[in-house]
Amino acid sequence: MNEYLKSQSIAITGANSYVGLNFIKFCLDKKIKVKAFCRNPGSFSDDLKKNSYFEGFPYTLSSKSELKLKNVDSIIHLANQRVNSSRIGFNIDPNLEGAKHLIAQCKIHDIKNIIFLSSHLAYKETLSQYGKSKFACEKFFIDNGHTVVRSGIVFGGEALGFYKNLLFALKSNKFFPIICANAPIYPIHIEDLMNIMLMLSKFTHNTKKLYCLGEKHSIKLNFFLSRLAYKFYNKKIIFISLPGKIIYILTNALGYF
C-alpha cells in the first residue's frame, strides 16, 4: 500500500481552503505528490513550497487556460465560488462553468477520476443557492463518469477558513444567533473525510458515483455547536433562534439567498 501511495500524484483545486490545506498535508505525510491549484499560490507557506512533493499553481473557476495536469492520477475538486451579490438576473453559475472546463482538461490529460466534494445541501428540492449550484455540478460530474462525495459539516484538523471563523465566533460570544437550530446534521471529522477521498481517488473504474458521508445518526445543529464550544473553550452558549422561514422569504424576494 505505502509503495503505491509514494508513486501517486493528486491535483487539488481550492487548495488553500480549510479542507484543501489539511488534505495537502495529509497527502504529503504519505509521500503523495500534490499539485495545488488556487487563486493565490503565493499564499502557501514556505514549508509547503520547499517540499519536493508539492507544487502550487494559479487557478480560478472562470479561467479557460490549460491546467498543469501532466502525470496527475486523479483530482480532488474543492474549489467553490459563492455569489455574494444579488442573484436577480444571475444566469451563469461559475461553479458549473469551472466543472465543464476541468472535465475538458481531464480528457486532454487522460485523467479518469475526479472526486467532487459536494454537500448534504445538494438535492433537487433544496432552497439554498449554494445547494442548487452543488446539485447542478454533481449531475454534470456523474454524467461524465466521475465521483461525487456529499459531505456533512466538516470539523477537526487544523482550523482554517469557515471552521476557524466558526470557532472564533463561539469563543467570542456568549449569545449565538442561529437559524434552524433544530436542523438535523450529519457531521464528519476531516480525518475520516480525507481518508475516504484518498481511497476513492485510487478507483479508476468505480461503478458507484455518489457517496453520502457523515454520522450515521443525525444530531441537531445547536447541539453540535454547543459541543464544540464546550470542547474547545469549556463554555456554555446561549442560542438565539432566528425565524428561518421569514428570513428565507425576505432574502429570496430580494434575490440574495
Language model regions located:
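N-terminal Rossmann NAD(P)H-binding glycine-rich loop of SDR-like oxidoreductase domains
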Residues: S9-K30
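SDR active-site strand-loop-helix element
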Residues: T13, F37, I75-A79, I114-H120, ...
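N-terminal Rossmann-fold cofactor-binding loop
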Residues: F37-G42, L61
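NAD(P)H-binding glycine-rich loop region in Rossmannoid oxidoreductase-like domains
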Residues: F57-E97, Q105, H120-K124
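Conserved Rossmann-fold NAD(P)-dependent oxidoreductase catalytic core, especially the SDR/UDP-sugar
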Residues: P94-S133, T147
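Conserved beta-loop-beta element that borders a ligand/cofactor-binding pocket
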Residues: K139-G157
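Substrate-positioning beta->alpha
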Residues: L160-K164, I179-S201, K208-C212
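Mid/C-terminal beta-alpha module of Rossmann-like enzyme folds, strongest
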Residues: L200-F257
